[in-house]
Amino acid sequence: MPYLLKTEPDKYSFDDLVRDGETVWDGIANNQALMTLRQMKKGERCVIYHSNVGKAAVGTAKVVSMDASDARNPIVRIKAGKRLQRERPLAEIRAAGVFQGSVMFRQFRLSVVPLTEEQYDWLTRGKEPNARRNGPPLLSY
């Protein structure tokens, strides 16, 4: 299952993750976000979303290790992936049909949100389900 990880770019941005290569994704206080974090597994894909400043999906990451032995403080290590060729701003995400009814908008303050495969594809490649698309992918390789 893919996930959306929200971060405040003035505190820790996608560029910081790229510079560091890997980081522990921590500082989560919300119980529902912690439950979602505990479900993550090694190898799962993530989209990094800048909240507060910029408000856009900006890049990808991958879970490289997970330790949920302490239920109150799961340790998830992520590795930087690729920057999206084109950031996906909040207004565009909100307008996308693939996000209708998403927990991302029902509980906007959650910092860890599960995504469907269709949502991940839309964020990283611009693909709507069953839609034809011309042009290059949004994910730079």
Segments from the language model and where they lie:
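Short, acidic Gly/Pro/Ser/Thr-rich loop/turn segments
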Residues: D10-Y12, Q85, Y120-W122
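Aromatic- and Lys/Arg-enriched surface recognition patch
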Residues: V58-E117
